[in-house]
Each structure stands twice: as structure tokens, then as C-alpha cells.
């Protein structure tokens, strides 16, 4: 029931999945899409023209002077769609899988000629983004690992670079994020289709450095578990005495659905032997 006071004098017709409205030569068909990504989200299909008004699904956080996907690079738009999905839709992945199946079962999916989301470009060729949504919602990953780190006096940074080198030595793609320069939203975008992460932070007051603590908070919020993806994690850290960052990160990452396969907890500045160990741990994560 609508609670907002301005609705009180309006004539409202509630609609749900399966309802249709004839608007004069055109038929609107409704499909409830709760939590994609609002509780009241709904798809509306304009049957005669094959247009799916998808609300938030299939959107991108871009605002361009032109309206259609054909005006821009498909690779650019799919990357923006991935960023939107990773940060806003991942939590609703089980619902999205259900809705894609529902659109298939009722014959609407094969009739879609255009998708008009609330945000970003209109898809005149919806095939690529529908395919990507199916992959993202099902936890399909590339042979890719995302490395995320912060550093205080460059010790953790040295570990990060050696781990990345080890990963690449196995022919696996690496995306690297330094949290003093990069945002968590960009890192989460790449984590969506990564098979694993390596995450590092120096210890500060027996806890991870704050930006990495914030990063792990967001990983728990978006909930990659919902995609069915089983992502491994390598944790690395430097410390001055007692440590504590690794233990905290391990607890929080496991709660967020990651499988922690290995850790490094280094005292002060890593020497050549420790850096060689970091390289091997990166290679092992890639394998």
C-alpha cells in the first residue's frame, strides 16, 4: 500500500506478474522484479514493439548526449554495465536468474528487440548484455585474479607486486588496485568475474589498514555468494610487532563468502627471501 501522502487522491491500479494493459493498439505486460534492485522494481514489456522497460536491470551509470548503444563502443558499455551489476545488482543475482528463466518460459525473452533501462544507454542490440547478465548472475569467471592492497611504508606494496608477478607467471590475467588511488567500486567490478583475489594491508592498531577494512565491508555487502561463484583469496600483510590484520581479514572474508587458501604475515620490510615466497604464493593462487 502506498504510504506517501501525495498518492492519496490518485486512482491507482496495482499490477503484478501476468497482468496486461491495453493502451490503445499497444499492450503492456508486467513482470515483478523485486530487489533488482528495489523492492518495488518491475519489468514492463511493450509487446507489439518488443521493448523491455527493465527498470534498473541492464543499466549503466553513464549519462551521454546520445541515447542508444549503437552510438558508443559495445565494449565500453558492457564494462559500464558490469560496474553497475557488480556494485548494485550482485546481491539480487538469485532473483535475476529466476527472472531470466521466467522471461524464457513465458516466451518474452525471444521477443525482446530493445531494452530501455532507467540508467544509461538504450540497448537496440540486447543480445550481448543479456548474455553477460546471465554469466554474471551465475558466477561465470575469467582466468583472472584481482589484487587489492594498501600500504603504509611500501612493505605491503612490495608484496603486492611480487604476488602479481607470480600470478602472471602462470599466464593468468591480473587487475591491480591501490586503494589510495582507486575506488572500491572499480575493484568490485573486476572481482565480479575474477576467480580469486589477493588482498593486502599493513596492520594498524591490530586491525587492517582502514581502506582495506572498508573494501572488505563492501565485499560483504555485495555478496558474491549469491552468484554461486566460489572465489579463493590470498591475504598478505606487513606488521611491526603483534600483527592482527591477517586474522581480522580472514574472518571477514570468510564471512563474505571467500575461501582463504593462504596468508602472508611479514615482519617489517620483506627481504629477497620473503619476496620470492610472495611470488610463489601468487603463482600457487593462479594455479
Model-flagged regions — what are they?
Residues 1-2:
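Anionic-ligand anchoring segments at beta-strand to alpha-helix junctions in alpha/beta enzyme folds, i.e.
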Residues 5-71:
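Catalytic core of the metallo-beta-lactamase
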Residues 28, 51, 145-147, 233:
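Conserved hydrophobic helix-helix packing surfaces used for dimerization/oligomerization
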Residues 56, 64-68, 74-115, 119-122, ...:
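FMN-binding flavodoxin-like domain, especially the glycine-rich phosphate-binding loop
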Residues 59, 122, 153:
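Short, glycine/acidic-enriched loop or turn micro-motifs at the edges of active sites
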Residues 119-145:
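Terminal amphipathic helices with adjacent charged low-complexity linkers/tails
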Residues 149-151, 237:
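Short beta-strand/turn micro-motifs composed of small residues
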Residues 156:
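Glycine-rich phosphate/diphosphate-binding loop of Rossmann-like nucleotide-binding domains
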Amino acid at each position: 500500500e502506498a504510504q506517501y501522502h501525495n498518492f492519496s487522491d490518485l486512482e491507482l491500479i496495482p499490477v503484478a506478474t501476468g497482468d496486461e494493459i491495453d493502451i490503445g493498439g499497444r499492450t503492456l505486460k508486467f513482470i515483478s522484479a523485486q530487489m533488482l534492485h528495489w523492492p518495488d522494481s518491475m519489468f514492463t514489456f511493450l509487446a507489439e514493439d518488443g521493448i523491455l522497460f527493465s527498470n534498473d536491470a541492464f543499466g549503466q551509470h553513464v549519462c551521454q548526449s546520445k541515447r542508444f548503444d549503437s552510438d558508443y563502443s559495445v565494449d565500453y558499455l558492457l564494462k559500464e554495465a558490469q560496474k553497475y551489476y557488480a556494485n548494485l545488482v550482485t546481491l539480487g543475482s538469485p532473483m535475476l536468474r529466476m527472472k531470466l528463466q521466467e522471461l524464457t518460459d513465458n516466451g518474452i525473452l525471444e521477443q525482446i528487440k530493445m531494452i530501455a533501462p532507467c540508467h544509461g544507454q538504450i540497448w537496440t542490440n540486447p543480445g550481448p548484455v543479456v548474455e553477460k547478465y546471465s554469466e554474471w548472475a551465475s558466477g561465470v569467471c575469467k582466468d583472472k585474479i584481482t589484487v587489492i592492497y594498501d600500504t603504509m611504508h611500501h612493505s605491503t606494496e612490495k608484496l603486492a607486486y611480487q604476488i602479481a608477478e607470480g600470478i602472471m607467471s602462470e599466464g593468468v590475467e591480473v587487475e591491480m588496485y591501490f586503494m589510495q588511488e582507486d575506488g572500491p567500486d572499480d575493484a568490485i567490478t573486476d572481482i565480479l568475474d575474477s576467480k580469486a583475489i589477493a588482498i593486502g594491508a599493513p596492520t594498524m592498531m591490530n586491525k587492517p589498514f582502514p581502506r582495506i577494512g572498508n573494501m572488505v565491508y563492501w565485499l560483504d555487502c555485495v555478496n558474491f555468494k549469491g552468484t554461486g561463484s566460489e572465489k579463493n583469496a590470498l591475504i598478505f600483510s606487513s606488521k611491526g610487532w603483534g600483527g592482527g590484520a591477517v586474522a581480522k581479514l580472514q574472518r571477514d572474508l570468510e564471512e563474505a563468502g571467500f575461501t582463504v587458501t593462504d596468508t602472508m604475515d611479514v615482519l617489517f620490510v620483506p627481504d629477497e627471501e620473503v619476496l620470492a615466497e610472495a611470488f610463489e604464493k601468487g603463482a600457487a593462487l593462479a594455479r
